[in-house]
Amino acid sequence: MELKEFKSHVKIIDRESCDTLRNNYINCFVNTTHSLYVPQIQIKHKFVDGLCYLGYLWDYIKNPIIVEEPFFDEVASKIKTVYVFWDIHSCERILIKNYWKFGKETVLKLNFQTLLEGEDFLPEDIYIFDDSMTWTLIKTHEDIQGKRYCLKSGDI
């Protein structure tokens, strides 16, 4: 799939709704009482490309369970529409050329299978959830023993 085709299958959520979705996600799935949450995530720092945080939300996920990537395919066969967003990082810290295909604070709504087919167009650390806000799946940029480090939280 080419980027243009992928973009034709996604809905970019408006800014106000993006903020609401992110805040609801954080309230549901992120341990905001962790001692490092405030300095790493809540307090944004000034960079040449705007205000960004330093850490990764997945470091503060409540009740994380490690899952393998095939689990995402299983879920995609059952759940059709999802949201996805990524960490708000600076180009000063992400040194991969042409990394951002969408805005840093963007939230997308799309078919789960389409997301999996087009994930090369997304940042490496992605947070996937649906309207129920009862579960999340996370793909990180890390790997453990040659397997991508993926997490789930909630009931799915």
For each of these PLM feature ranges, what is it?
Residues 1-156:
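Structured alpha/beta or helical-core interaction and ligand-binding surfaces enriched in interleaved
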